[in-house]
Structures are given as C-alpha cells and as structure tokens.
Amino acid sequence: MAIRLNYLDTSFERDFAAFLTTKREVSEDVNAVVRAIIDDVRARGDAALADYSARFDGIDFTVTGMAVTSAEIDAAIHAVAPEVLGALKVAATRIEAHHRRQLPKDDIYEDQMGVGLGSRWTPIDAVGLYVPGGTASYPSSVLMNALPAKVAGVPRIVMVVPASGGSINPAVLAAARLAGVEEIYRIGGAQAVAALAYGTETIEPVAKIVGPGNAYVAAAKRQVFGTVGIDMIAGPSEVLVIADRDNDPDWIAADLLAQAEHDAGAQAILITDDAAFGDAVEKAVERQLKTLPRAETAAASWRDFGAVILVPDFDKAVPLANRIAPEHLELATADPDAMVPAIRNAGAIFIGRHTPEVIGDYVGGSNHVLPTARSARFSSGLGVLDYVKRTSILRLGPDQLRILGPAAIALARSEGLEAHARSVAIRLNLGEEG
C-alpha cells in the first residue's frame, strides 16, 4: 500500500518533508573496487578488459573479438521483428527532428564601442555511450543518447555494452545503426568506463561519457570525471501525476505502474483533489498488478515508495510538484495549460490526459534521459547542448584598447597582478607606471 498524505492534516508539512528525503537506493561502497579496476585498465589496457570480460560476462575475446563487426550489426537488424524495427525507425526520425531544433547558433556581433564579441559553438570531438546489458538493455536509450550527439555533429560516437556470453540484444545493435553508431565494443562495467576515459590499445579515449549503469558504472563515471565529462548520475525512475476525478482511474494507475515496473526503487506519485478518485486509482493499481509480468518489481516500488497526496485544490499541487522536482510530470486535469507556467522544476512535462509519459519514453521525440532524485531543481534532460561547447570570442582594435585599457590596468593592479596590468600598458606605451 502506497503512503497516503493529506494537505489539510496538521502533520502534513512534517510528513511531506520526510517523504521528500526518503532514500530509494541502497548505497554500495564500491569506490575502492572501482578504483582498482580503473588503475588496472590504465596499466594493462586490452589485457585487463579481456580478463574482466571473461570473469564477469563469460566472454573470450579470442573467439568473439572485442569490437562488434559491421556484419554482426547487419545480422542483428535482420533478427529484429519487423514491427520493432519499424517502431525504432519512427522513434529515430522523431527524436532526430526534435533535437535539430535545439542546435545553437553562433552569435558574433560588434558593440557600440566597436568591440567584437560573440559565442561560437563546436561539437565535442568524441563521445562514449554506455549501454547497460541484461534486463536494462533498452534500444530506445541508444537512440536517446546517440541521436543528439549525431545532430550536434560529434564526429566519433563509441558505444560499449556488456555482452553475456558475447551476445548483444539485436535491437540494441539495430538502434545503434539507425543512430549512426558503428564503433561498438562488447565490454561493460567500470572497466568499460575506464577504457573510454583513458583508452587502450584498441579503444581510443573519448572526451565525454554518457549513459546509465549500475553502482560500479556510476562510481567509475564519478572517478573519471575531470579527465572526461559525464552526463549525469542517474537514479531510479520517477513520475508525478497531477490528476482530477474526470480521469479514468485505470489510465492513471497504468501510468503509475509504467514507472514502478522499472525498478523496485522507482517512485510513482499521484496528487489529486478528490479522495474518492485517489481510492479508485489505488484499487486500479492493485487490480492491474495481478496481470503484470513485472508485478513483483512494480508492487515493491508502489508499496515502498508510492504515494497518493490529497490537496484541497490544484493551486496547492503546483508548489508541491516544484518541491518534488520529478523526473516526469503528467498534468491530467481539465486545464493543464494553466499549470504549465508555474512549473519550475521537472525533467519533462506531459500535458493532458492523452499524453502518457510512456510516449515520451519512446516516440514523442523529446529525450527520455532526464534528471532524477530532485536534481531537476538544477539540471536538465539530455539534449544537443550536452554534446557541444561554447567558446567566447573577443576582438579589439587600437582604438578600443585605448578606451578600455586604463580600466583593465586599474582592476589588475587593484588585485595585485602587475604582469596583467603591464600586458595592457605596454600596448598603450604607458610604461611600467602607466
């Protein structure tokens, strides 16, 4: 049974604050193990990768090879069911089109003083995409991570994916082909992150690593950050649904369970202004759980971290939503557009009863790599801007230097940086005391 909170209860603020700080992940202290793996890969390169892959994934690179061949990708595409391949193509087309609208433009201009200023955008040289294996091997995530990089103009996109026994989900390889990724290695874990960051005899290093993974992958990303950039450290998935009584309870229950089935640590929250509707949704959740293939996972998520929050009116719902800062926010009310301007903290907003969050997971076009664990308060979902860099541009002529130089000299000397001051003064023939 999910937790039940009522805005009008005297204990609500205390209970809600406690709810916000509920820990949904079991912390594993894997830093020492990960550091040893990273150091080993840096020291032994391919040999270390071969050893770890044999130990953890049962792979013999002398048989399978480390790199996935183009022929293997071709075969994978033929192995994917036609309806799945068609759906991946629909998703890829929409994701690429939407992300093209995110491309920033250079802005070079001259101000009233005649000083040239501006910003220039360039793609990152090389990006590494980590794709989880096993039950978390999602081809849709390949598209979501790789296509924005392709749109940004990243010239080299590398994919690593753990391959138990050497095999990789064919749909994952098909998605890679659709996204233009051809450099793929069957490695995973902290060792794959280390290889991407520092390089080996076979794998050239990249400049940034993106993609989710387990505790070892997350720890490795943290440890290599600074040598390379990273996207984010993703936590369990979450959804907040704000819904009125005019919704079908089964629809809302299905949306809640769509998140709950991801992980026992996932979180699904309903905010409603109608207690009877909240009851109906809870009953619908219990009913639908009986037929879900991943019922055990979804039930644990709903039991341990789910919530139904009753508010007297939806004016109270929006401030609560901003405090929760959910990864996904569904607005299933009579006038959802009226709420949108007041929503400040959400990874993605899904507007109206006919916009289930799942459409955003796959074929909507927006990205499903979003900030979790309340990090939407200060960060954004993955997009083209994650794969480009902004360089500032500045140009002065002699006239502009004469105008601005004295102020620069004064500020430099006020900070005790005489060499800074002289760098300008020498151009103005002011001497050391100028």
UniProtKB/Swiss-Prot annotation:
Pathway entry: Amino-acid biosynthesis; L-histidine biosynthesis; L-histidine from 5-phospho-alpha-D-ribose 1-diphosphate: step 9/9
Annotated protein name in UniProt: Histidinol dehydrogenase
UniProt binding sites for NAD(+): 130, 191, 214
Record field: catalytic activity: L-histidinol + 2 NAD(+) + H2O = L-histidine + 2 NADH + 3 H(+)
Binding site for Zn(2+): 259, 262, 361, 420
Keywords attached to this entry: Amino-acid biosynthesis, Histidine biosynthesis, Metal-binding, NAD, Oxidoreductase, Zinc
Known role: Catalyzes the sequential NAD-dependent oxidations of L-histidinol to L-histidinaldehyde and then to L-histidine.
Cofactor(s) the record lists: Zn(2+)
Entry EC number(s): 1.1.1.23
Molecular function GO terms recorded: histidinol dehydrogenase activity; NAD binding; zinc ion binding
Coiled coil spans: none
GO CC field: cytosol
Binding residues for substrate: 237, 259, 262, 328, 361, 415, 420
Keyword Metal-binding: yes
Gene that encodes the chain: hisD
